[in-house]
């Protein structure tokens, strides 16, 4: 079957924003205007189509990035139908992993900002992730109808807070309750949407006289930005010639695709104004799969030979699984993005990361939580497969005859853990199954059993992250669980280099003995790098080469539980440079034990320290409560990084140890009568002060 829409008319876009910038409402309006949704779902009523988990509807925040397919031909029906896949991404900082995961499979993004709140903390995180994956983007300044809305202030913040190069594509006519429409700075016309049909139809009008001067100034800015796309256009512009509408659009598109500029649109999704023109901008300025760099990978040939897959149906099939979701009706749904080739339902594909074959039974295209079964998918498509058995997020699915492993996704280590136990013994098995399922869906969530206490431990990116997972266990799997006190994921490392540390394991009393002897140097590595490095510098065969991996293994086992307080050891380099062996008594086990003895000894001598996770916290508070908020943050060992005035008060940026932040949400609410809000994300590991380290080590020793 031939593809219905040529790949040049595909747009794979993400919609990304801070909480409450109105992203879900914006997505709802997109679905409405593209003809998928006949009644607009309001988040206020918990009825939005995109928020498809019960919890999201209760909390009014988006947790799962659902992928939706729709078609758009322009608000004046000026284009051929374009196939738009929308990935809805969460705006809460505990779900950064979801954002990262969806950024990986997008070609372009729409960043939604609140016209009142502007560029908020989470916006910066999302921006950094979009930079990391080189995602071209446009901005939509939403909520122009709200008190305190100011379009040009947000444009300024895009520059000052994100270091972006914003170019307004539109201006807002009026603001707050006087917001009536927008000015299209390319056409130099005002656009007025018809309220009677919820903004489906519109009229072009002349620009209001009181805005003519401002519009001319910003039109000039837009044309200048377009002219910078090429020397040829610049010469034409400087020569006083008018650039045509087509030339302006083509030039702006080139610059957006290179991420040199971010075009800024505006509107009010709630009032049905502006989303239609923003959709047109998606078509005109964001990339098709063929406009972005081809995806790189490695061949599964044992040599890791680099390979490329282009967005082309003729190339061998390759796809990336970017999300696993459990659906109450069909079981496992594996969302995947097809990078090259074609695959049909019923085909067998290879999961090249796990070297396992999987049969693609049914393929569905999702509209939030409704699904349509399709027979085949092509390069550029985003779809979900039902019933794949052993696929996890980040795995590659490909043609078994042309195996390739696409770039893997990297997932952060969890920073917080809690013990969980089922309320009834009968639920033990059910809880194990539920946690296994949830861990498969979310790579930033880990589950293990504590060997000493026998407790089940779950770990994640923040308190809210774990709350929601425990809540999902209750709702989706009917497992009620008791949750212990949150524990911080400390780490251990060393600060000094030590040389010639010996490790000897010798038992030679009659019969076959054991003998292993190693000499190592240990030194600290820079933080945030590989974490552990083992260098073999044995010359002259003082240790036979078949025993070298055993030494490494012995050390790696010690890394899991450090000598200070049993926390994982990071940022250590070990050089194995001398040792001795016995022809008969030496074995792998003996050298493994010798390696671990040397490591323990060296660690004690190398000035060991405890590292604690430091969080980047931003608090937005009305000015009246500023003193209380600052005093409280100081008590929590916070280091103030900066302060800014906002439309509603002050924003404070602070670095605070995670161990001091438990229960902060409740404390902040009571200090500010619920008027302040905060966001928190992991920043780095730093050395814990000696009094804190001492208390932690003593508590672990009990």
Curated annotation (Swiss-Prot):
PROSITE patterns: G_TR_1, G_TR_2. The keyword Cytoplasm applies. One of its GO terms (cellular component) is cytosol. GO terms for molecular function: GTP binding; GTPase activity; guanosine tetraphosphate binding; translation elongation factor activity. Its main location: cytoplasm. It holds the Pfam family EFG_C. It is found in: Cytoplasm. Catalyzes the GTP-dependent ribosomal translocation step during translation elongation. During this step, the ribosome changes from the pre-translocational (PRE) to the post-translocational (POST) state as the newly formed A-site-bound peptidyl-tRNA and P-site-bound deacylated tRNA move to the P and E sites, respectively. Catalyzes the coordinated movement of the two tRNA molecules, the mRNA and conformational changes in the ribosome. Belongs to the TRAFAC class translation factor GTPase superfamily. Classic translation factor GTPase family. EF-G/EF-2 subfamily. This is Elongation factor G. SUPFAM superfamilies: EF-G C-terminal domain-like (SSF54980), P-loop containing nucleoside triphosphate hydrolases (SSF52540), Ribosomal protein S5 domain 2-like (SSF54211), Translation proteins (SSF50447). Residues 8-290 form the tr-type G domain. Transmembrane segments: none annotated. GTP binds at residues 17-24, 88-92, 142-145. It comes from the Bacteria. Keywords: Cytoplasm, Elongation factor, GTP-binding, Nucleotide-binding, Protein biosynthesis.
């Amino acid at each position: 079957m031939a593809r219905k829409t040529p790949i040049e008319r595909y747009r794979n876009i993400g919609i990304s924003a801070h909480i409450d910038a109105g992203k879900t409402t914006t997505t709802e309006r997109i679905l409405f205007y593209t003809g998928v949704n006949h009644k607009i779902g309001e988040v206020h009523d918990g009825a939005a189509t995109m928020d498809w988990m019960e919890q999201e509807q209760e909390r009014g925040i988006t947790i799962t990035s659902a992928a939706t397919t729709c078609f758009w031909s322009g608000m004046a029906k000026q284009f051929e139908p374009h196939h738009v896949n929308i990935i809805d991404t969460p705006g809460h900082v505990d779900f950064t992993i979801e954002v990262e995961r969806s950024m990986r499979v997008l070609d372009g993004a729409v960043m939604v900002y609140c016209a009142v709140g502007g560029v908020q903390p989470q916006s910066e995180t999302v921006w950094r992730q979009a930079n990391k994956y080189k995602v071209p983007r446009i901005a939509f300044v939403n909520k122009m109808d709200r008190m305190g809305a100011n379009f040009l202030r947000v444009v300024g913040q895009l520059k000052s807070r994100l270091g972006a190069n914003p170019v307004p594509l539109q201006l807002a006519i009026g603001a707050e309750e006087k917001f009536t429409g927008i000015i299209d700075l390319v056409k130099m016309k005002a656009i007025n949407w018809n309220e009677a049909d919820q903004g489906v139809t519109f009229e072009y009008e002349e620009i209001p006289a009181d805005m003519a001067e401002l519009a001319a100034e910003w039109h000039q800015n837009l044309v200048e930005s377009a002219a910078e796309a090429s020397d040829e256009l610049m010469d034409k512009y400087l020569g006083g010639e008018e650039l045509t509408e087509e030339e302006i659009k083509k030039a702006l598109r080139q610059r957006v695709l290179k991420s040199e500029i971010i075009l800024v649109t505006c509107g009010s999704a709630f009032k049905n104004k502006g989303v239609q023109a923003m959709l047109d901008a998606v078509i005109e300025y964001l990339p098709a799969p063929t406009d972005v760099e081809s995806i790189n990978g490695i061949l599964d040939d044992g040599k890791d030979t680099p390979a490329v897959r282009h967005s082309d149906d003729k190339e061998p099939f390759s796809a990336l699984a970017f999300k696993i979701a459990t659906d109450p009706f069909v079981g496992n749904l594996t969302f995947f993005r097809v990078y090259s080739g074609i695959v049909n339902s019923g085909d067998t594909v290879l999961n090249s990361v796990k070297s396992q074959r999987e049969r693609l039974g049914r393929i569905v295209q999702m509209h939030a939580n409704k699904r349509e079964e399709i027979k085949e998918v092509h390069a550029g498509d985003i779809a979900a497969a039902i019933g794949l058995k052993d696929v996890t997020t980040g795995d590659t699915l490909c043609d078994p005859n042309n195996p390739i492993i696409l770039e893997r996704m990297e997932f952060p280590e969890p920073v917080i853990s809690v013990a969980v136990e089922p309320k009834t013994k009968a639920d033990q098995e059910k809880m194990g199954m539920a946690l296994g399922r949830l861990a498969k869906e979310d790579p930033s969530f880990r589950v293990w059993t504590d060997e000493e206490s026998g407790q089940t431990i779950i770990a994640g990116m923040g308190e809210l992250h774990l709350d929601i997972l425990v809540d999902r266990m209750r709702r989706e799997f009917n497992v009620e669980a008791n949750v212990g006190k949150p524990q911080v994921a400390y780490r251990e490392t060393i600060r000094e280099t030590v040389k010639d540390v010996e490790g000897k394991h010798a038992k030679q009393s009659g019969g076959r003995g054991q003998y292993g002897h190693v000499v190592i140097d240990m030194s600290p590595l820079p933080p945030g790098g590989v974490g552990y490095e083992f260098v073999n510098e044995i010359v002259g065969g003082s240790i036979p080469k078949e025993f070298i991996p055993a030494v490494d293994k012995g050390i790696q086992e010690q890394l899991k539980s450090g000598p200070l307080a049993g926390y994982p050891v990071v940022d250590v380099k070990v050089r194995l440079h001398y040792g001795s062996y016995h022809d008969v008594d030496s074995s792998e086990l003996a050298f493994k034990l010798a390696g671990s003895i040397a490591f323990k000894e060296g660690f004690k001598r190398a000035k060991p320290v405890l590292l604690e996770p430091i969080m980047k916290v931003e608090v937005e508070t009305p000015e009246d409560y500023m003193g209380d908020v600052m005093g409280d943050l100081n008590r929590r060992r916070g280091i103030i990084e900066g302060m800014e005035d906002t439309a509603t008060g002050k924003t404070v940026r602070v670095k605070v140890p995670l161990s001091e932040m438990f229960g902060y949400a409740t404390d902040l609410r009571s200090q500010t009568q619920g008027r302040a809000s905060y966001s928190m994300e992991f920043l780095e590991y730093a050395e814990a002060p000696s009094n804190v380290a001492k208390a932690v080590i003593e508590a672990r020793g009990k």
